[in-house]
Amino acid sequence: LRSYRWFGGDGLRAFSHRSRMRQLGFGAEEHLGKPLIAILNTWSDINPCHMHLRERAGQVKRGVWVAGGFPVEFPVATLSETFQKPTPMMYRNLLAMETEELLRSYPVDGAVLMGGCDKTTPALLMGAASAGLPAIFVPAGPMLRGNYRGQPLGSGTDMWKYWDDKRAGLIGECEMADLECGLARSPGHCMTMGTASTMTSAAEALGITLPGAASIPAVDSAHCRMAAASGRRIVEMVWEDLTTDEILTADAFEDAVATVLALGGSTNAVIHLIAMAGRCGVPLTLEDFDEISRRVPVLANIRPSGKYLMEDFYYAGGLPGLLGRLARVPGALHAERRTVSGGTLGEQVADAPVHDEDVIRGPDTALADEGGVAVLRGNLAPDGAVIKHIAAEPRLLKHTGPAVVFDDYHQLQLRINDPSLAITADSVLVLRNSGPQGGPGMPEYGMLPIPSYLLAKGVRDMVRISDARMSGTSYGACVLHVAPESWVGGPLALVRDGDPITLDVRARELRLEVAGSQLADRRAQWQPPPRRYER
């Protein structure tokens, strides 16, 4: 055991370490020779996605004790998508570094990683991958479905929908008060297929959770049992020396990409999975997403791309059911690879039942023939851009319209409802200086608001282009992550009001219909914008 280096033997250091364990109240007979399991807990009073994890950590400990291990709980940074500004994206790598260094520096033999809110999952897995110990992930789980006057509500997705209705004058403060109370009713992360559900599902597809773990509602008693089972399993993994490098392989990342695309999942998964793969030495690229998206259909009928919510998905069979259906697509999954269960992915999903064929589809009844996220290229995005086309109005997937340009998010907020801009439903809204450096931190500004006077006319989607990200709960014909970003002089910086822009998702193209000579003249005149932050 790795921990024996700290506590075993008759040297001064071992004596000192055992003495300090006694100071903590633990005799040598309680921990010496047993796997020490770090429980990395992202619980916080200010993070509603994780507010139940203090209790769940106790259930993980129970499992560790039962299996003959010794649990030690570590509080780590909590990344709350709801409250942290300007964006928790700026802190993902900080949590990844904290995770890695805690696991490297303390006398632990394995780790249980607890979290679920958007950036937490990739951060914990990145850190654990670099540390290289046996590790298992316990997803926080989705909250219960919301309720508005008897109708199910999806967090994020229905918030945007009803906010647009309010801006259009269709509902008032009374309705908004009911919505405010009904949108989020329990602990857990968003119960739509937002970034949280997407990334915890990706973690399960990677094989770093127990089968079915990602779909269990946060407050379901099955979630308690899963936490305890994860505690038991990590002790076994330590004795088996089953480390992250045996789980997080190139095949595993390809399967995670296929799963995200079949779920109609968040565009943020593109950024996170590429970063996670990089930590594991796996060369995952935008081209891999593009290639896989062309052969993997959308099988999950979950908002914002579909009709249902994560609670329905769980009852319908959860991620094991979806993976079982995805396995029917030739070449979609690598069934022989190992997972933390000790078996193979194929064994996990071979007999996984599906109880509702409308929630979890088969290849013959797919919501779309191609994966939910498409990679775009062209003279406006030479290094690529993405669009969640499954959540856009089909009429906009091949569209040419005049640009209406906003230089930053503040200007967008001030001017979007200005009638003098003469924005029409055919206009293409462009937001720049919202990328990693320009934002800063690539905030989720990409679902640009539609002018209120168009909302009042019934317009609910427009082509919108930015170098920002958007929430996984968002929807619409939003082209995101345009690269290079405008702040460093990417082509987005050269767009002017009225320039024709063409989006063609089927052809994977994003083009600025302006002559190259004109663009060269504009580039010669371009000046980088002033930095808007001091640190």
Predicted regions and their residues:
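Catalytic or ion-coupling anion/metal-binding cores of large enzyme and transporter domains
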Residues: 1-38, 42-45, 49-51, 56-76, ...
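A short, small-residue-rich loop immediately preceding and capping a beta-strand
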Residues: 103-124, 135-140
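Short, well-structured alpha-helical segments in soluble
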Residues: 94-106
